[in-house]
Amino acid sequence: MSSLLLLTNALQPSTEVLPALGLLLHNVRVAPAEGPALVDTPGADVILVDGRRDLPQIRSLCQLLRSTGLSCPLVLIVTEGGLAAVTADWGIDDVLLDTAGPAEVEARLRLATGRQQLGGDDSPMEIRNGDLSVDEATYSAKLKGRVLDLTFKEFELLKYLAQHPGRVFTRAQLLQEVWGYDYFGGTRTVDVHVRRLRAKLGPEHESLIGTVRNVGYRFVTPEKPEKGEKSDKSEKAERAEKAERAETPGKAAAETNEAAGARSSKV
């Protein structure tokens, strides 16, 4: 029997949110679908989030929960129509239809807790790209070991671009994915945040966020020199240095003989 925490704003009992729970022997506690609810609520084996309504708010809640370093599986409950809105960046471990039967619910809960136990020793998820590292667990980003002082949205924007290196996103796409469906500001917001991000990356690394004219932005992966090319250059430099060293004694001897000849002719 597992300890389940159901986050919901519905005034219905848990068996109305997910009827199959009424046929299973798990211990279910209910709390408001808000981030602070976790502070006043004891830990759980699995957190269930009621996403049958208000998907933009629930998406933000799931991302917030994941950003706090949540150590237990996060399972989203949605209607069949809500499945189309769910993507990987929600930060959830699994998704359940509210009409799922008890056998399916039991299997998914068992798999979610099993994966958590198997992966319990894994380090927090970190995105590495060249000199840049983005730690989703601590919401921090480092460039050559230097911690970047980023706002929440600057971090989210950098993380999203770094997760998809080379892929071009329009301003509208970034606005939807980073700011959310419920944001009603203009795409100019994206330009402002990109400009601030580049300033914080510094002149040497501002090109990590590339502009695709008349389209949008992309994360540019730093190019690494080919091993063969690097070794060829090293060999050429080494040969040139050896030749210069071999030539130097000859030049010195010639200059000495020339000077001696000049003195004897004067005499």
Swiss-Prot record:
One Gene Ontology CC term in the entry: cytosol
Matches recorded under InterPro entries: GlnR_N, OmpR/PhoB-type_DNA-bd, Sig_transdc_resp-reg_C-effctor, WalR-like, WH-like_DNA-bd_sf
Biased composition (Basic and acidic residues): 221-248
Annotation: DNA-binding region: 124-221
Superkingdom assignment: Bacteria
Residue(s) carrying 4-aspartylphosphate: D50
SMART domains, A to Z: Trans_reg_C
Keywords: Activator, DNA-binding, Phosphoprotein, Transcription, Transcription regulation, Two-component regulatory system
GO MF annotation terms: phosphorelay response regulator activity; transcription cis-regulatory region binding
Region (Disordered): 220-267
Stored CDD domains: trans_reg_C (cd00383)
GO biological process: one example: regulation of DNA-templated transcription
Transcription regulation found in the keyword field: yes
Biased composition (Low complexity): 252-267
Biological function: Activates the transcription of the glnA gene.
Protein name per UniProt: Transcriptional regulatory protein GlnR
Native organism: Streptomyces coelicolor (strain ATCC BAA-471 / A3(2) / M145)
Gene name, Swiss-Prot/TrEMBL: glnR
